[in-house]
């Protein structure tokens, strides 16, 4: 290798068989439609979109455009994507059985996995409809009191359609 290009020369391989490698960092962010936001304090058993303290919340999927380096939407408008979502109990550090956070998007409500403060290992698939700017509007309801964190991940598929070891996180 003299010019930074890796080529396999064993067997019957040819240089034309080398796959191109493209890196495009990606992730999720929770926004108010325009800016990343910290989700405000909520009242137990009340939807996040209901007053008092109502917030318009979105999960935005973004990636780096490999040509410009700018952040762009990762999913086209109108895409329905199964995103893995979870909650993490921070204070208290363990979750109460049967008191799951539920996520609502496009009139579909899905209870999501609860995880202790020690770490997030369980997720639930949530169908999300992404609109303009790769944003999925959502509301959530937590039927208990305490401090929680929300997590999102999406397995980035291989070009051939199979699962990869890489996840978009947020």
Locate each region found by the language model.
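Core sequence-specific DNA-binding domains of diverse transcription factors
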Residues: 1-170
């Amino acid at each position: 290798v003299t010019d930074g290009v890796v080529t396999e020369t064993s067997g019957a391989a040819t240089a034309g068989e080398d796959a191109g490698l493209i890196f495009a960092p990606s992730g999720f962010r929770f926004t108010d439609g325009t800016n990343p936001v910290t989700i405000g304090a909520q009242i137990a058993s009340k939807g996040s979109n209901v007053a008092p303290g109502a917030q318009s919340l979105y999960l935005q999927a973004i990636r780096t455009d490999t040509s410009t380096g700018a952040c762009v939407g990762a999913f086209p408008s109108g895409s329905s994507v199964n995103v893995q979502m979870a909650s993490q109990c921070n204070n208290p550090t363990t979750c109460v059985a049967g008191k799951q956070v539920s996520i609502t998007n496009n009139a579909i409500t899905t209870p999501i996995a609860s995880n202790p403060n020690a770490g997030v290992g369980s997720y639930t698939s949530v169908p999300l409809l992404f609109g303009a700017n790769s944003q999925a509007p959502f509301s959530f309801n937590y039927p208990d009191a305490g401090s929680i964190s929300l997590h999102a991940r999406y397995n980035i598929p291989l070009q051939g359609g199979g699962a990869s070891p890489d996840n978009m996180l947020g």
